């Protein structure tokens, strides 16, 4: 691996594109390896990712996955838990052959204006007069597609799950003038 090179997981989405553009702006001379996954029988974002990589002068590496689950046992043995985003196993494996640094836009949707459908729903559920706790509840309702069915009965027994504790964690983010 080369310490002068940086790898980035590139999905062609807003988040990874923004990270790549900022990386190129701040490190104009560094060699960047952009890594994308092409899944068999799925929507293919790699042509768009290739254009983005070219625009920001990054070498684009496409991993073709015919059998997404072929390395599942190995990935679980490393992480010690089942992991939803199994593609990371393949991205990290490829990145390790090229550099010691891997960047991604993972988790940036809320920071970089992704998931606009959630913002529209949040605004439809709240008003300028909504209390902070009402805003927290509306925010969680916007994420209902991420919930596990019967999560209260499942998690309550395993980890003392409590909606009140979730609300108290999120409350500071909605008890301000920026949350509407």
Predicted regions and their residues:
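ATP-dependent adenylate-handling active sites, centered on carboxylate activation for C-N bond formation
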Residues: 1-180
């Amino acid at each position: 691996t080369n310490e002068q090179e940086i790898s980035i997981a590139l999905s062609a989405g807003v988040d990874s594109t923004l990270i790549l553009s900022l990386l190129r702006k701040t490190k104009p001379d560094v060699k960047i390896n952009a890594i994308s996954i092409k899944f068999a029988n799925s929507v293919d974002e790699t042509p768009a990712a290739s254009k983005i990589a070219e625009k920001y002068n990054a070498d684009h590496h496409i991993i073709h996955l015919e059998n997404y689950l072929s390395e599942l046992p190995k990935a679980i043995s490393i992480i010690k838990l089942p992991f939803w985003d199994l593609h990371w196993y393949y991205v990290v494996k490829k990145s390790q052959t090229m550099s010691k640094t891997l960047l991604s836009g993972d988790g940036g949707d809320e920071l970089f204006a992704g998931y606009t459908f959630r913002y529209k729903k949040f605004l439809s559920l709240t008003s300028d007069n909504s209390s902070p706790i009402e805003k927290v509840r509306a925010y969680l309702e916007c994420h209902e597609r991420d919930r596990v069915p019967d999560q209260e009965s499942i998690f309550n027994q395993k980890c003392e799950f409590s909606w009140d504790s979730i609300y108290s964690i999120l409350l500071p983010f909605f008890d301000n003038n920026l949350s509407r």
